[in-house]
């Protein structure tokens, strides 16, 4: 498939060298299977992405991570789903997490993000990066009006 070819190409290029092997049959562990089943049910899809496969080496870590992701990203809240994904993508850009940038940009698109919205998002990320660097270099003092007391 396209995903396998892309992953294989990236692995050959050496850009995605995991520090752990991908578990071969993670669902043989009942705790992992329960999490994977909940991911499938929550997303309405049979696709389990690499993040979850790799975290399956430690069922407790997998359970804890999915619990938090589900509570924040997959539960209705005051933020709409596209906004949540774009916030996650912006933080992922700041943290240089290539996997997260790709997965959350894809999730934002799947949840209805338009190309116009993506272009605006990238403009904001670019502007924030540039002005953050400028202000850090200049060491501009914070206005007292911005302090929360």
Segments from the language model and where they lie:
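Acidic, Ala/Val/Gly-enriched low-complexity intrinsically disordered segments
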Residues: 2-7, 13
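Hydrophobic alpha-helical segments
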Residues: 10-149
């Amino acid at each position: 498939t396209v995903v396998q070819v892309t992953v294989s190409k990236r692995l050959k290029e050496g850009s995605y060298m995991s520090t752990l092997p991908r578990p071969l049959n993670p669902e043989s562990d009942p705790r992992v299977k329960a999490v994977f089943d909940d991911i499938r049910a929550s997303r309405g899809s049979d696709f389990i992405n690499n993040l979850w496969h790799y975290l399956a080496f430690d069922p407790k870590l997998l359970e804890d991570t999915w619990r938090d992701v589900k509570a924040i990203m997959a539960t209705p809240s005051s933020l709409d789903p596209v906004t949540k994904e774009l916030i996650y993508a912006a933080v992922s850009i700041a943290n240089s997490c290539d996997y997260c940038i790709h997965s959350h940009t894809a999730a934002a698109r799947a949840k209805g993000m338009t190309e116009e919205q993506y272009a605006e998002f990238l403009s904001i990320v670019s502007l924030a990066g540039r002005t953050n660097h400028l202000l850090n270099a200049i060491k501009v003092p914070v206005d007292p009006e911005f302090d929360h007391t």
